[in-house]
Amino acid sequence: MHKKFFTIGIIVIVIGCIGIIAGAAFVGQGFAKQMYLVESMKQENIKLGDLGVTGEDADKVIDNAKYAQMVADKVREDRHQIAPSYEALLGGKHFDPTDPKQLSYAQALNLENYLYLAVASFGIVDIALGTGAFMIITGIALILIGILLFKFARKIPEESS
């Protein structure tokens, strides 16, 4: 048995196991955060129709990136009808929470930020899930390579000095 290939095989298998464990952690965190996002959005119970979306999807609760993006874009469009920018809204003055126009603009801005943050969060979840899956597959491949190195080490005699 060739000790050098045997040792390399062990190292490769250990790295593969670490990859699988890390990948499983990524996947676990990804699914946990995805469930958290979906449940949090369902608790808010904001429906597409509440924000001006018409059609067959109007009664659906915003609970995914597609709906959040669609509605955030709609809120942004509606907000720009109030004023093209925050600076234009204030007209060189300070924010006045008693002004209904400024208050509506601020509420739209908050809702828009909430929805775009949800879109970004779902994207990060997808990245975590994809990265975790890749790490698991890579870990499995490394373990298989380590096993092949073991078999190879058995067939090669130890070099004599």
Give, region by region, the residue ranges found by the protein language model.
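Juxtamembrane interface at the cytosolic side of transmembrane helices
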Residues: 1-14, 123-161
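Alpha-helical transmembrane signal-anchor/signal-peptide segments
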Residues: 27-47
